[in-house]
Structures are given as C-alpha cells and as structure tokens.
Amino acid sequence: MVHVWMVKTDRVLSEEEAAALTACLPPERRVRLAGQLPRQQAEVLWAYGLLLALLRERCGWREIPSMDRTDSGKPFFPGHPQVHFSISHTEGAAAAAVADAPVGVDIQRIQTPPRHLARLTGLEEPEPFFESWVRWEARAKRTGTGILYMVRHRPPLAPGEVCTAIAAFPGYAAAAAGAETVLPEQVRRLTGADLLGCLDIWA
C-alpha cells in the first residue's frame, strides 16, 4: 500500500529545529546537504522530516536508516529492501511516499514553466504543464528513469504501474506512481507546525 504525506512549509525553521532535523539524516545525506544553498537546505530538511514522520508511523522506525543509490540515482535503503520510498520538495511544500513496492512522488508549485520545458512538452499554461510534469516526474522517480527521457518519450504505463494525481495545497500539483491507486484516505496533509509537533527530536 502507498502512503503519501505532504507538508506546507509555511514557517521558517529555527536554528535549533534545523540542527535537530539535520541530526536525523543518514551521514551520507548530511554530507550532500552541507554543499547546498540555505534555501535548498531548508526544503531538503522539511522533506526528510516528513519522511521520518511517515516511517515512524508506518514502520515504527525512530530514525532514517542508511541510504544508497542505484546506478541511475534512485535512493533506497540497502538494509531494508522491502521498504520503498520517495521524496519531493519545491518552494513552500514537500511530499514523501512510503510503500511495499517501488514508488515515486512529486509535488510542484504552479508557476510560469521554464520556456525550454514548455517548448519541449508543448504545454505553455502553468496548470496543464505542472499537472503533467508531476506525473512524469513521479513515474521517473519510481523507475529511476531520467525525467527528460520520460518527457521526451512519454512511455505508456507499464503493466502493474499506476499513476495517481493527488490533491495538494492550493497553487500546487502533486502525483504518485506505484503499483496501485493512491486513495484519499492514504494521503495526509500537514502544516509545518503539525509536522514539527509529531517529531519528538528536540531534546
């Protein structure tokens, strides 16, 4: 079963909160985080905080385990191959998905699409562009296929593959790809305060 959580990052992380969330990351992810810009760091921390909360509820884990990447760049838990996950972050929001089969999730703020991508997709209006883009991105994340391959070739759904549009926050588009349809009761939407409140990591 696929479970998707989304958070509206409607507040700025304090230094204490950012440090506590950083401490929850696997060591290899902390190294990558250090090389990113502050705004990108905040988006990543919200996304991984969301993943941690979801893993705690669905798997009973207290921390995010060590991660690795496939040759195509898809992240996975080498010590827990039965648990599949995906995260996504954009300006003002993040999403995480956990499932018992390969899964991909994407969330995007709806805005004017980049010109080169609008030309590539043939979609110039913001809503149609991003409603399509999150589907392509979710499918690419599920398989580890590059997003440009997905956009250029737009392959049909593979046998057993399902891609579901998810009602996100106003001004955002989201989708999840997996082995089954994501039902409304499998989706949870949180505020930043909600998420931080369910993570007891401030000791």
Describe the function of each predicted region.
Residues M1-A203:
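Core catalytic alpha/beta fold that binds nucleotide/phospho-ligands
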